[in-house]
Amino acid sequence: MKQYKDLCRHVLEHGEKKGDRTGTGTISTFGYQMRFHLQEGFPMLTTKKLHFKSIAHELLWFLKGDTNVRYLQENGVRIWNEWADENGELGPVYGSQWRSWRGADGETIDQISRLIEDIKTNPNSRRLIVSAWNVGEIDKMALPPCHCLFQFYVSDGKLSCQLYQRSADVFLGVPFNIASYALLTMMIAHVTGLEPGEFIHTFGDVHIYQNHIEQVNLQLTRDVRPLPKLRFAREIDSIFNFAFEDFIIEDYDPHPHIKGAVSV
């Protein structure tokens, strides 16, 4: 995708060397935005092969409200293993905040259910927001949320989503995040009777780890190929009824996978 290659070039050309929590070191910039028109194809990177199974199962895991890696491991997904404790627990991470946010008065709020109801009944609302940044529980999380807040917007029968990501690993994380939130937007559009609009990806600290520079430069030498298409295998009326088998990716023809170490 041209938008992704432009992001890589921007960070390499304008970023500054910074230390970071992991000790790896980064080239970092602050503030950047990409836009993807979902009618033009499913924005899954073609300059390297992505593991769609991991993207889809992680999103389904979030939507279940699950915070234990057991479900992921049972489905061949290992992307959260490094942060889990000996029992597979991660603390109140994304799934917990999306589905059972704990308010100050002890009330539990299902943000996803509330969001979908609001899209159906009050599509012009400016409060179509889900937040994973629960300040009162951050210290209990294995990893504070990187993609921490997203908002929906309905216009002309189309549903658009804007994500704010406070911290973005350009090589490993960002390609997953793009595809994940594009998929979520398409799923919510489907169950609310809307068409997919745009996915808008807004970054805070967007960085390339020092040990990923070679891989990023390799991607920049590769041509951008046509985007794949994503469709659903059946009609589904609830966001919580989707299964992995419902996602059909067509015409995905990426360049080969590129390995890169995760900084923990």
UniProtKB/Swiss-Prot annotation:
InterPro entries in the cross-refs: Thymidate_synth/dCMP_Mease (IPR045097), Thymidate_synth/dCMP_Mease_dom (IPR023451), Thymidate_synth/dCMP_Mease_sf (IPR036926), Thymidylate_synthase (IPR000398), Thymidylate_synthase_AS (IPR020940)
The first-level EC class reads transferase
An annotated Gene Ontology molecular function:
thymidylate synthase activity
Q: Which residues bind dUMP?
A: 21, 126-127, 166-169, 177, 207-209
Q: Which PROSITE patterns does the entry link to?
A: THYMIDYLATE_SYNTHASE (PS00091)
Where, by residue number, does (6R)-5,10-methylene-5,6,7,8-tetrahydrofolate bind? Answer: 51, 169, 263
Protein keywords: Cytoplasm, Methyltransferase, Nucleotide biosynthesis, Transferase
UniProt GO cellular component terms: cytosol
| Places the protein is found | Cytoplasm
Active site per the UniProt annotation: 146
Q: Which GO terms describe its biological process?
A: dTMP biosynthetic process; dTTP biosynthetic process; methylation
Q: What Pfam families would the database entry show?
A: Thymidylat_synt
According to its UniProt record, in which pathway does this protein act? Pyrimidine metabolism; dTTP biosynthesis
Keyword Methyltransferase on entry: yes
Return the EC number.
2.1.1.45
Kindly state which reaction or reactions the protein catalyses: dUMP + (6R)-5,10-methylene-5,6,7,8-tetrahydrofolate = 7,8-dihydrofolate + dTMP
Subunit composition?
Homodimer.
Regarding protein family, the annotation reads: Belongs to the thymidylate synthase family. Bacterial-type ThyA subfamily.
Q: Describe its function.
A: Catalyzes the reductive methylation of 2'-deoxyuridine-5'-monophosphate (dUMP) to 2'-deoxythymidine-5'-monophosphate (dTMP) while utilizing 5,10-methylenetetrahydrofolate (mTHF) as the methyl donor and reductant in the reaction, yielding dihydrofolate (DHF) as a by-product. This enzymatic reaction provides an intracellular de novo source of dTMP, an essential precursor for DNA biosynthesis.
| Annotated protein name in UniProt | Thymidylate synthase 2
Q: Which organism is it from?
A: Bacillus spizizenii (strain ATCC 23059 / NRRL B-14472 / W23)
What would be the name of the gene that encodes this protein? Answer: thyA2
